Amino acid sequence: AYRRIWLSGGMAAAIALLLILWSPWNKSDSTAPDIKIFAALNVPEQVTTQEKNGRIIVSTPPTTIINLTLEDGTHVLLSANSRLEYPKEFTLQNKRIVNLTGEARFEVAKDSLRPFIVSTGDIQTQVLGTVFDVNAYPCNTPTVTLYRGRVQVAKTDSSHRKEISPGQSATLETNGDIVVSKATQTEKEGWTDNEFYFDNTKMMQVLQSLGTWYNISVICHSPNLLQKRIHFRFNRNVSVESLLDALNDLGIAHFQYKNEEIMVY
């Protein structure tokens, strides 16, 4: 069963916090190729639930977060544009396996005899009972962030695992290495509080987050902007136009919504 998280529209203006750390944006480099940061996905317009061969598949549309409770008592907060597949009943004697595309927070019910495994295709996260996030959108680098307990992270095709502690993130790099680093807790927790919260975050990651939340293609016309870092906090329950107006107030770049795409100059 799931419970929709309703986002309060009245909060948007009240909690906006914009910090400006840069001089006005650089002029667009007309010689550099455009970079497509995110391509809109084929996702449902509302929450969908399917049952097939004893497995349940839940998919979320843009700008929607839902709560799920699995058969073993595990609680899942499933983010927008995400898909979770799990068994109706955990019948295996030695493990509990779910499959995730997108982003979710798991609060895993303890079961010392059956580890809980989240598989994203690229990485597997194994736990006994804990609280953690998995971000595995197609456009993003797969990342696991731990809040409580212990988890082990491994590439899907590897037996070598890395264990992370609370306050750490494990990221699968393009070369196949799993890199462990200190997590920015507030930034990682922002989406569960219905906020965009970026703390010294690279523009590339910011644009990926906007694309995945609204399911809108994002194109950067000035690649040198992608390494800029941004401090930004804003409620998620606003139109894309309102959000881009707030980002434009930072003075770091020009954001425009045109032809169902976000353009960045």
Q: Where are the regions a protein language model picked out?
A:
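A residue-level detector for the "anchor" residue at the start of short, highly conserved motifs
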Residues: R4, S8-M11, L19-Y265
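Hydrophobic beta-strand segment of the Class I
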Residues: A14
